[in-house]
Amino acid sequence: RQVEKYGKDTAFFSTNCAMQEPLIASILKEGAIFPQQCCPSPYHGYPAALGIDVSGHEGDVQYMLDSIKEKLTEAGQEGRMSTWAVPVNMLMIEAGVEYAIEFCEGKTDGAFDEAVFTSIIDKLAAEKGTTCQLSKYEDGDVKLDNFFLLLCDYYDFSK
């Protein structure tokens, strides 16, 4: 109904994880814009919404990106829907584990070593052919030195 009301150049976004699958399916059908999910990842909503069989390809991010691109291209939506090339949850978990290893091996300068953490994030993003920008959480006069916000490049399915 909203695409009919506002047109196909309307972008839709939801922070409700349970709504990602029906949202993706509806946007694909109606031809609207889907910038990305609340938790950007090729695995978040896309496989079920597009009918992609993941069997035998669990954890294969490039397979998933290629499969999504194929489905979006069939529907003429490859330039109107996106995600991240690196699943955000996988990135956070892998970075946390790698940082913990560095910490346990005495390769950090104590409780939190921002340079080591940043280099780990940069390395993991680069492995997926993308970049990740880190920024510290700020709210007015409050700036938290150990609370980072992540922003990776959008994956362009039209390329």
Task: State each model region's role.
Residues R1-K159:
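A residue-level marker of the well-folded mature domains of exported/periplasmic proteins
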